[in-house]
């Protein structure tokens, strides 16, 4: 323009310098990020970052560097916060969900949770058990698993499910004001007949192999299960990235 006659040349020099210094890609990426930031003043996330699908830790890593956002907690987000705070029932539930949907990456790769003790326990306990009804739902899986690995995930799924039922019963007994007596499931099983009895109705069980359940005291953890719970608990409590991500969720809760 007549007011700033050198402006065009000035801009051309900037662009030429970006190109000659081989910073064109970096410049384009930076401009795209700037456009995103200016376009979205505040990002509102409608919960359940940790529900089923893979890569929850990747989303949280991205949010760590995001300028302005809030999270409307979903039940899965709250569950993970409970696990990160050391609640063993929540920990078992988180692992069970991961096994159910074949999503091990978030636990192992994302947060460094050691699942080897669970795998070893499951292989020993259910070595001759097909665990058919505990097959993972692969439509949400984070990888393509071979038959051997699928077999192992299935065994782990069954093992942690039984442990979860036992741990939940401890909480229900300790906090009767929750009114969750109906969620104590193992005591409703007639092990001799292989049926589940609820509100006067009987349901034939699709799986009757429960080697770690004592019918006389169904919620008592075996020594091996108790040791396993302690190892997994330690792993969750020592995951720095998990703590960081849960702290982020707490700080950025939506109003």
Residue ranges and their predicted role:
Residues 1-255:
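Feature recognizes metal-dependent phosphohydrolase scaffolds
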């Amino acid at each position: 323009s007549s007011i700033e006659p050198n402006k065009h040349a000035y801009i051309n020099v900037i662009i030429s310098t970006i190109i000659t210094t081989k910073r064109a890609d970096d410049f384009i990426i930076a401009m795209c990020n700037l456009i995103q930031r200016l376009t979205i003043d505040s990002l509102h996330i409608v919960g359940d970052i940790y529900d089923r699908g893979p890569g929850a830790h990747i989303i949280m890593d991205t949010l760590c560097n995001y300028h302005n956002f809030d999270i409307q907690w979903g039940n899965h987000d709250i569950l993970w916060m409970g696990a990160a705070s050391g609640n063993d029932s929540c920990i078992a539930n988180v692992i069970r969900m991961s096994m159910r949907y074949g999503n091990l990456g978030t636990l192992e790769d994302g947060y460094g949770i050691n699942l080897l003790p669970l795998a070893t326990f499951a292989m020993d306990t259910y070595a001759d058990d097909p665990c058919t009804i505990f097959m993972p739902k692969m439509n949400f899986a984070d990888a393509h698993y071979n038959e051997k690995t699928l077999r192992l995930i299935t065994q782990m799924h069954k093992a942690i499910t039984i442990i979860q039922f036992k741990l939940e019963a401890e909480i229900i007994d300790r906090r009767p004001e929750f009114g969750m007596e109906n969620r104590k499931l193992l005591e409703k099983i007639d092990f001799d007949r292989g049926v589940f009895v609820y509100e006067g109705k009987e349901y034939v069980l699709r799986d009757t192999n429960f080697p770690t359940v004592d019918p006389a005291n169904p919620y008592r953890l075996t020594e091996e299960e108790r040791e396993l719970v302690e190892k997994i608990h330690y792993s969750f409590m020592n995951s720095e990235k998990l703590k960081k991500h849960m702290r982020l969720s707490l700080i950025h809760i939506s109003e």
